[in-house]
Amino acid sequence: MNKLIQSKLELLPTSPGCYIHKDKNDTIIYVGKAKNLRNRVRSYFRGSHDTKTEALVSEIEDFEFIVTESNIEALLLEINLIKENQPKYNIMLKDDKSYPFIKITNETYPRLIITRQVKKDVGLYFGPYPDVGAANEIKRLLDRLFPFRKCTNPPEKVCFYYHLGQCKAHTICKVDSQYFKELAQEVAAFLKGQDDQIIEDLRGKMAGAAQAMEFEKAAEYRDLIQSIGTLRTKQRVMAKDLQNRDVFGYYVDKGWMCVQVFFVRQGKLIERDVNLFPYYNDPDEDFLTYIGQFYQEKSHLKPNEILIPADIDEEAVRAMVDTKVLKPQRGEKKQLVNLAIKNARVSLQQKFDLLEKSIEKTQGAIENLGQLLNIPTPVRIESFDNSNIMGTSPVSAMVVFVNGKPSKKDYRKYKIKTVVGPDDYASMREVIKRRYSRVIRDGLTPPDLIVIDGGQGQVNIAKEVIQEQLGLDIPIAGLQKNDKHQTHELLFGDPLQVVELSRNSQEFFLLQRIQDEVHRFAITFHRQLRSKNSFSSQLDGIEGLGPKRKQNLMKHFKSLTKIKEASVDQIVEVGVPRAVAEAVREKLNPKTQEQEQAQLREVAEPQIGLE
C-alpha cells in the first residue's frame, strides 16, 4: 500500500457509494459498491485475502469514490460504471445483461408487465430495478392496489384475479377504457413517489374495516401501507427517459472551487469529471466560465440537456453552449444536481484533509527532496507565481515554507510595475530581481531552494537574474502543471531536465502543496486588487459616496454584481442617503438610448383618465 492510498483511506466517508480502483496507468481495474465506503475500501488493505483479491490489491495504485444517497443507488451506479469501463477484475458483471423495468403498456386496456427492454414507444417505463425479484415485489403490490387486466387474450368468463379484486374483467363487465387511462395515471404518480393520497385512502379503509370488526381485511390494508413504505426509496442514478444529459454541481471553500460533472447517457450515470482550482471572481461567475471552457477547450460533446444548480443564470449558460439548460426545482433531476454538489463538497474537503495530513510528514520529505536534487536539505523554500487576466492588474506572489510548513509571516505580494500587458517572463524577471536585490541589500536569509510555478522559460529567467545579474548561488527548480491544472513535473539541473519523482511520495505531496499555496495566494491577491480597482472605478465620481461608504457597500454586498442587482431601498439600508443610493443605481444601471426615448414619449403623451 503506497502513501497516497494510506492517506486517502483515513479520509473516507461512512456514506454509501461506489469505489473505483485504478492501476499505475490510471486505468480502472475494479468497481465496487458499499453501504459504508470507509469500512469496505479499508478492508482491501487489511488482513489476508483469496488469490484473486490479492492479485487485485497488488495492482491498486489509487482509488476514487462517488457518494450516493442509498444502497440501491450505489448498486445501480456500480452496474453503469462496470458496463461503461469494463474493468478487468469485474468478471461477474461484464456481460451486457439488462435490468428489469415495470411497464404500463399502451393498449386500450393496459397491462402492467415486467420487461428488460426499454423501447422508444409510448408505453410508460419505471425503474430499472436491481433484480427481477425486486421488480416482481413491486408489481405484486401494484396488482393489489390497481385492477389492471392480467390476461393477454381476454377469457370468455371472469378470471381468478377478478375474484381477488385485482381485475375488472373489462370485456365481460363492459368497463369504459377511460377508467384504465385514469388508472394508468394513478400508477404513474405512485411509481414517481406521489403516494400520499393512496396511503391516506388505505388508512381510511383500514380504520373502516377495524371499526366493522373485519380484522383480517384491516390487516391486509396495514400490510399494504407497510409495503408502500419499504418501496419509497427513490434512486437517482438511472432515469426513465433515456436522455443524454450532463449534470453540474460545484462547491467553494477557502478560495477553492470543486466542480463535479455527472455524465448521464441513455438515462444511466456512467462517468464523472471532477476538477479543483482556485477561483478569481464571484463563485457563480467563475462557474459559468468553467462551463463555457468545458465544452470548448476540453472538447466535450454537448448532450441533449444540461442540468445546473438553482443559483446559476441559465440564460447565460444557454448562450454559451447552445443546448437545452434546466435548473430543476424538484424531482429526480433536482436530486441529481444535489448529488453532484454533495460529491463536489466531499472532494474539496478530501483535498484539504490530504494537505493537512501531508504537513505531519514534511521533515522526511524535505530531506528526501534534497537528496533527490543533490543539494543540502532545503529547510527554507521560497516559491513564486504570477497572476493576471489578459494583462489586467498583473501581480506576483511569494510564499515561504520552513521545515516543510508554510511561514505566512514571510509571504510577500508584488504589484508589477515595469511590465505592460500579459508578459509572464518579464513579470517573473521583475519580481525575482526585486526580491533578491532586497535580500542582498538588507542582509536577509536567502532560501535553500527557489521553486518557480512554471516551465522552462520562467525557470531560465529566474536563473539569469539570480546567477548572472545578482551573482547568487541558490538552486532553482520549476513545477509544471498538466491540462487539469495539477502538479505534473519537477524541472531541475543545468540544462533543465525532468526529475523522476513518484506521485505517491511525500516529497511530491510537499511540492504539490507549495504550488497550490503560491497559486492560491497570487490569485487571491489578484482578485482583491482587480475587485478593488473595478469597484472604485465604477463608483468614482458619485457625489456623496466617499471611501467609507464605498467600503460599507462592498462589505455588505460583497461584489459589484450584487450592488447592481440591489434596489434603492436595499442600498439605503447600508447607511447611504437616498439621493446617493439613486445615483449609485443610475451609475451602475445606465439607461439605454431606447429606454430614454421611450420614457420621453411616455411623458409627452397626454394621459387619458376616467372621470
From Swiss-Prot:
<protein>
    <recommendedName>
        <fullName>UvrABC system protein C</fullName>
    </recommendedName>
</protein>
<dbReference type="GO" id="GO:0009381">
    <property type="term" value="F:excinuclease ABC activity"/>
</dbReference>
<dbReference type="Pfam" id="PF01541">
    <property type="entry name" value="GIY-YIG"/>
</dbReference>
<dbReference type="InterPro" id="IPR000305">
    <property type="entry name" value="GIY-YIG_endonuc"/>
</dbReference>
<comment type="subunit">
    <text>Interacts with UvrB in an incision complex.</text>
</comment>
<keyword id="KW-0963">Cytoplasm</keyword>
<keyword id="KW-0227">DNA damage</keyword>
<dbReference type="Pfam" id="PF02151">
    <property type="entry name" value="UVR"/>
</dbReference>
<dbReference type="InterPro" id="IPR035901">
    <property type="entry name" value="GIY-YIG_endonuc_sf"/>
</dbReference>
<dbReference type="InterPro" id="IPR050066">
    <property type="entry name" value="UvrABC_protein_C"/>
</dbReference>
<comment type="function">
    <text>The UvrABC repair system catalyzes the recognition and processing of DNA lesions. UvrC both incises the 5' and 3' sides of the lesion. The N-terminal half is responsible for the 3' incision and the C-terminal half is responsible for the 5' incision.</text>
</comment>
<dbReference type="InterPro" id="IPR004791">
    <property type="entry name" value="UvrC"/>
</dbReference>
<keyword id="KW-0267">Excision nuclease</keyword>
<keyword id="KW-0742">SOS response</keyword>
<feature type="domain" description="UVR">
    <location>
        <begin position="196"/>
        <end position="231"/>
    </location>
</feature>
<feature type="region of interest" description="Disordered">
    <location>
        <begin position="587"/>
        <end position="611"/>
    </location>
</feature>
<feature type="domain" description="GIY-YIG">
    <location>
        <begin position="14"/>
        <end position="91"/>
    </location>
</feature>
<dbReference type="Pfam" id="PF08459">
    <property type="entry name" value="UvrC_RNaseH_dom"/>
</dbReference>
<dbReference type="Pfam" id="PF22920">
    <property type="entry name" value="UvrC_RNaseH"/>
</dbReference>
<comment type="similarity">
    <text>Belongs to the UvrC family.</text>
</comment>
<dbReference type="GO" id="GO:0009432">
    <property type="term" value="P:SOS response"/>
</dbReference>
<dbReference type="GO" id="GO:0009380">
    <property type="term" value="C:excinuclease repair complex"/>
</dbReference>
<dbReference type="Pfam" id="PF14520">
    <property type="entry name" value="HHH_5"/>
</dbReference>
<dbReference type="InterPro" id="IPR047296">
    <property type="entry name" value="GIY-YIG_UvrC_Cho"/>
</dbReference>
<keyword id="KW-0234">DNA repair</keyword>
<dbReference type="GO" id="GO:0003677">
    <property type="term" value="F:DNA binding"/>
</dbReference>
<dbReference type="InterPro" id="IPR001943">
    <property type="entry name" value="UVR_dom"/>
</dbReference>
<dbReference type="GO" id="GO:0005737">
    <property type="term" value="C:cytoplasm"/>
</dbReference>
<keyword id="KW-0228">DNA excision</keyword>
<dbReference type="InterPro" id="IPR038476">
    <property type="entry name" value="UvrC_RNase_H_dom_sf"/>
</dbReference>
<dbReference type="InterPro" id="IPR001162">
    <property type="entry name" value="UvrC_RNase_H_dom"/>
</dbReference>
<dbReference type="InterPro" id="IPR010994">
    <property type="entry name" value="RuvA_2-like"/>
</dbReference>
<dbReference type="GO" id="GO:0006289">
    <property type="term" value="P:nucleotide-excision repair"/>
</dbReference>
<dbReference type="InterPro" id="IPR036876">
    <property type="entry name" value="UVR_dom_sf"/>
</dbReference>
